[in-house]
Each structure stands twice: as C-alpha cells, then as structure tokens.
Amino acid sequence: MAQQSMKVRPVLLKRSSLESVELVKQPHHRRSKSQQVRFKEDGNIKNPTGVTEVNTQTPEDPGVMGKAQASRHHHPTTYSLSFPRSHKAGGFRSISIQTSPSLRKHFPVFKRKKLTTSKSLVEMPTASPSAIQVNGNLSEQDIVSSDLAFLRLAQHLEDGPRRLKIPHPFLPRMPKVQSNGPVSFCLESGTWMSSEKATAAIQVPDDICHSPTWEARESALSPESSAEESNSIPALISMCPGDGQRVMTSELERMPPCSNTNSSASNMPGTEKLTPELLLPKDNPDDKDLGLPSSQSKKMCVPSPPRTHSSPEPGSRSQPVHLGRSSDCPASGDNHQDLESLRSSSASKSVPVCWEHVTKLPSQSDTPELQTGVGSEQLPASIPRQENRAQSSREIGGSNHSHLAQGELCDLQGRLQSVEESLHSNQEKIKVLLNVIQDLEKAHALTEGRNFYRTGQDLNNCSTCQNTACIIYSVEYDFRQQEGRFHEVLQSLEEAEPTEEAPSPPKSPAEAPVPEKQDLRRKSKKVKKKCFWWI
C-alpha cells in the first residue's frame, strides 16, 4: 500500500501544482518529494504545505493562490522556524511534524505579529471598491473577532482542522478559518498585497470548535444571527468613513445582545446596557429574552492571541467577557474613536485577569455589587472569599502539622518492619547455607570413606569448607551491618520518645519486636558457636 501511494503521489502533486498556474516553480516539486518520503507510512495522500492552499481553494481562482505562493518566495525574512499549521488537505489530518528546513520557511513569525499590526494588513489593496481598509492602529483582536463573527454562518463544521469559505457582501472572499492549536493570528504575507481576495488564516483553539455547546449554538442560532447581521452591518457601515468601517462592524458584532432588544441595529445608545449583568441569569429578569443573544455573543467574542477562550456550559449564560471590553462598553457611544480606544485598552489585558473574571462571573451572580459594574465591584466581592480560603488553609495546615508527627512515626515503623523482614530473611539464608555446607561435607566424607564430619573442621583438606566459608562470612557481615542500622533506628526512636510524649501509646507496639530481635541474635550466636567453633 505504501509503495502504491508513493507511485501515485507525485502525479497528483504535479497536477495540482500545474493547476496553480505557471508561477508555482520547481522548488515545489522538490518539497513534494521530500514530503512524500515523510508521509509514506500514512498510506493516505497528503499534499505538501505549498499545494494544500490550491486544493482547498475553489477551482475558479487558482491563479490568485498561485500569485500568493509566488509572493511568499519574495518575503523570506518574515518567516522563522515554528510549528506548522496542519491544513485540512483532502479530508485527512497530517499528524507528523515537519522537520525539513525547506518545509519550515512558510510559517510566519508569531511574536512580531502580536506586538504590531502586520505589514500585509496595512498594505491591503483598495483595488476592489468594496474592499475594507484596515487602520494601522487597530489591534488584531478586532480583526479576529470581526472575522470570527462569520463563523456562525457556517453550518458544516466538522471535527479536526477546518478551512471555511463564507461569502460576505463587503468582502470578495471570506477569510479562511482553521482551528488547530492555540489561538494565534497569522497572515500569509503577500497574499493581501498580491491579490484582491482577502485570505487570512485564523487559528482557533480546538476546545471552542470541538465542544458540543459550540456546535449546538452554531446550528441553533445560525438563521437568527444571519438575519441580524444582514440588518446590522449595512446600518453601521453607512455611519462610519473608510478606516472606521472595520472598527464599527467588529464593535456591532460584539453588541447584538443589547441592540437586539431595541430591534434596531443602529440604536447605539442601547449599548450602554451591555454589562455582564445582562448575561448573568439571576440578576436580570429580562435575561430570558436575552438568552439567545448572549449565547450568540459568546460565539462572536473569540479572544485575540494573548487570551484563552473557555467553552461555557449550556446552563451558565455567563459570557467569557474580556474585562476591558465589558467595563468600557457602557461608555461607548456613536463615535468610533472611543471604540478604538476601547479596543486598545481591552487588548492590553492579560490572560490571568481574563480567567479570573471568567471564573468569578457565574459564582458571584447573586451579589448585589455586580449590578453597579464588574470592573470596580468584582474584586471587593472576591476578597472575603479569599480570606475564608486563607483561614481554612491555615486550619488545614495546623491539623496537618499535628498529624505530621504521627506520619513520621508511621514512616519509622514501616522502616522498622522492613529492617525486621530483612533480618529474618538473612537469618534464613544463613541457616540454608549452613545446611547446604553440612550436606556437602557429609557427601565428601562418605565418598572418602569417613564416617564422621564436622562443618568447617577440615579447612586444610576439605574443599567444601575452603570454598564456602567466604560465603558464610559475607552473609554474616551483611547481617551485622543491617543489625547496626536497626540499632540506629531504635536509638532515633528512643531519642524521639522523651521529646514527644503524646504519640507514646502507638510507640509501644513498635517496641515489642525488640526482645524478639534479641532472642534471634541469641539463636544466631548459638548457631555460630556450633558452626565456627574453631575460631
């Protein structure tokens, strides 16, 4: 099977690379050969990274992706060694890590793109009249959230890495969405510059797209969300000039819960109600009406690279709100400059803050402080809980400290038992060895015609005594050594006994085997006297 796939694969690779127009050059064939060796054991036809773009693209625009691939070769400096994005090629998942250096150079630098907006975003062409210009001051969170908002229109979500193409009235091509690994926003550089199609690769964590609640919300809410989006986006696009379009659409897609209650997408003062209390079930009586929009906003607010997204349970309506966005939303009005400042402030929040407030939202929904605002009241509400936890931890620490002495005693008793067992086993070994020596001696005496024998009597003539005495001495030496360790343990126990008077009752059974040990030593001494009487 592997050999057949090896024979079939180069033909398919050449065909697909020819479909991507003559701009795809010879290096693609070299890379496909190296990758053919790499994926030989899979038995499934997997395309190399350079060709998967062509296969996942619709057959009507292979030339555009060919330009994109050609433009990659002109920007070798923007790539560094990083983990490859696994593409959905032919329905199969490539599971092996690409270690060849010629395959690694496609993948962009993530660190630089987290800090500043990438060149490819700023240099996006305005050739098509409906193309959206991106302001250089925008954070990548805006682009991620606005692009991910269209994910809810896709009803053919599958498990594993996926690339979706969804049409949109303002974009000629919907950005491709790929879910694998951590949330990171990476743009194939040169694609925006060389083509009119906006193709971005957004990596979404697996727990978002794979969780049943995500897919349930996806299937249940896609008709409503599509209708709402068709109403909302044109209204705000008409409000804002060129560079502000992206800002307002992304902002609107975060705010449909409150604007939906007024049944008007352009009613922006309704956003002054968008505080996390709307999304908590016990604070707002109107939440029954807002249930679907709140869960819908869960879908749209997919965090940017520095954040993590918790897939909430269906029962809890609490949205994983970014703290900056939730606390700043009441101040947002009609002007998009405030919204830009909100984006920059919310983008600066770190992961622990987000997680802290996500975990606190459902648990503290009963406290009245939340109704005045999350940013100012949540931390004081959490202070008494932390004090209670600290007190309980102190009590547990005290009880652990009291139990510590008993634990050490149990440990010492266990060591004592192990030493006793080793002593018993060594004594049995000595007895067995002595019996073996006596049997050998008896056999020697009978063969030599002697009717008498004493163990170790004939050291000069008896080869058995000469060969086995060292064994007996070595066993005896080990026995003495372990006996010395046993006495050390006993002394440590006796020293610990006057200092700790409380654990003295459980100590008494541990002292019981001591006379037995003395009896055993007496017996072993008698045996030694019998065996080594000449010493």
Curated annotation (Swiss-Prot):
Residues 411-448 form a coiled coil. This is INSYN2B protein. Signal peptide: none annotated. InterPro entries: INSYN2. Pfam families: FAM196 (PF15265). Residues 219-232 have a biased composition (Low complexity). Belongs to the INSYN2 family. Residues 23-85, 215-346, 360-387, 493-528 are annotated as: Disordered.
